[in-house]
C-alpha cells in the first residue's frame, strides 16, 4: 500500500493506493498551525477488510509525529482507532 498526501493551508487528505488503484481517503482540516482534525475516513467497498482505513489513520499519526502536530480525531473510525491504540498514540492526541 502506498500513500499520497494533498495539503493546503486549511485542509488536506491522504489517499491509500494499491498501484494505481485508490483504496480510500482520510480528510482533515487544520485547527491552527500545529494541529489537525481528522474529519472523515472512507474506504472503497472493494478495499474493505484490507487494512486501508487503519493505514490511513496510522499515516496521519506518522505525519503528526514527524511534524510535531497534534490530532483531533472527530471521524468515528479515527476516534475508535485512537481508543484502540491510546497508549501508542497518546503523544499526538489533542485532549
Name these PLM-found stretches.
Residues 12-23:
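Conserved beta-hairpin
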Residues 34-45:
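Conserved acetyl-CoA binding element of GNAT-fold acetyltransferases
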Residues 21-29, 37:
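Conserved beta-strand in the GNAT
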Residues 1-13:
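Active-site rim helix/loop that mediates acceptor-substrate recognition in acyltransferases
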Residues 60:
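Aromatic/hydrophobic pocket-lining residues that form π-stacking "cages" and hydrophobic walls in ligand
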Amino acid at each position: 500500500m502506498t500513500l499520497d498526501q494533498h495539503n493546503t493551508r486549511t485542509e488536506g487528505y491522504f489517499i491509500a493506493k494499491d498501484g494505481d488503484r485508490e483504496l480510500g481517503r482520510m480528510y482533515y482540516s487544520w485547527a491552527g498551525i500545529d494541529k489537525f482534525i481528522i474529519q472523515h475516513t472512507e474506504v472503497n467497498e472493494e478495499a474493505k477488510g484490507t487494512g486501508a482505513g487503519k493505514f490511513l489513520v496510522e499515516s496521519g499519526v506518522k505525519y503528526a509525529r514527524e511534524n510535531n502536530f497534534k490530532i483531533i480525531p472527530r471521524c468515528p473510525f479515527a476516534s475508535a482507532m485512537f481508543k484502540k491504540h491510546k497508549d501508542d498514540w497518546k503523544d499526538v492526541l489533542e485532549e
